Amino acid sequence: MKKIIIGNWKMNKTVSETRDFIQKFDIFYQENVGKIKEDLDFAIAPSFISLSLISKSLTKKLEIAAQNLSQFDSGAFTGEISGKMLQDLGTKYVIIGHSERREIFKEKDEELKNKILQAQKYDLIPVFCVGESLLEFEAGLTKKVIISQINAIKSVLNFQKAIIAYEPIWAIGTGKTATAAIAEKVCGMIKENFGKDTTVIYGGSVNSKNINELVSQKSIDGALVGGASLDPEEFGKILVNS
């Protein structure tokens, strides 16, 4: 199965900083393109105001990902961004259900289901995030939590045109990374329960030093990269090492 790397910038980088990133990334990519696997897919999810800048990259393989979308199609929903708007920009992927949105913005299963439906309506590939807390991990509840999170939306998700991103909450932005063995076990469990052809990627303190061991695992199809994707050279090195 092809590998995919998606950089999630969260609420970082202004428009001018995004332009600077793209210029530097393009240079790195051109200098190192021969070291990057031809079948590797990769994308960046910047803030909404910088989405259109990704398409300006000279690296034509670089796809656009969005960090969120509205559960509504259109109308009087101040501040929302619709799936149709994202599609019109040429967006390929959209992150749904990230733990930060579940925890901080109190997004619930019904809203996540509606977002998945909107994404699929406009031919966007949902990157559906699942993950357990440190307490749940230490209590041995990882499998129960992950299966429950996916079961909550499986009635609307087209698994053949979606990505499941396993991001243990205890490893997001903490510098702690689930060992490759732990990540492989959970990603393998997801495939066993929801289809061996399901694309499953890992996220949680991924960087250029640990990416190779992670994507070398049988059940890990790529990575959702946070902080390490903010540096153009580091993101490029992640692609080289994938």
UniProtKB/Swiss-Prot annotation:
Coiled coil (residue ranges): none
Enzyme class, first EC level, given as a word: isomerase
A single GO BP: glyceraldehyde-3-phosphate biosynthetic process
UniProt cross-references to InterPro entries, sorted A to Z: Aldolase_TIM, TIM_sf, TrioseP_Isoase_bac/euk, Triosephosphate_isomerase, Triosephosphate_isomerase_AS
Gene3D superfamilies listed in its UniProt record: Aldolase class I
GO cellular-component term (any): cytosol
MF terms in GO: triose-phosphate isomerase activity
SUPFAM superfamilies referenced in this protein's UniProt entry, alphabetically: Triosephosphate isomerase (TIM) (SSF51351)
Residue numbers annotated as active site: H98, E167
Compartments where located: Cytoplasm
Recorded catalytic activity of this chain's protein: D-glyceraldehyde 3-phosphate = dihydroxyacetone phosphate
The protein's annotated pathway: Carbohydrate biosynthesis; gluconeogenesis; Carbohydrate degradation; glycolysis; D-glyceraldehyde 3-phosphate from glycerone phosphate: step 1/1
Keyword Isomerase part of the UniProt annotation: yes
Residues that coordinate or bind substrate: N8, W9, K10, G173, S205, G226, G227
Organism superkingdom: Bacteria
UniProt entry keywords in alphabetical sequence: Cytoplasm, Gluconeogenesis, Glycolysis, Isomerase
EC number of this enzyme: 5.3.1.1
The family this protein is said to belong to: Belongs to the triosephosphate isomerase family.
Description of how the protein assembles with itself and partners: Homodimer.
Stated role: Involved in the gluconeogenesis. Catalyzes stereospecifically the conversion of dihydroxyacetone phosphate (DHAP) to D-glyceraldehyde-3-phosphate (G3P).
Protein name per UniProt: Triosephosphate isomerase
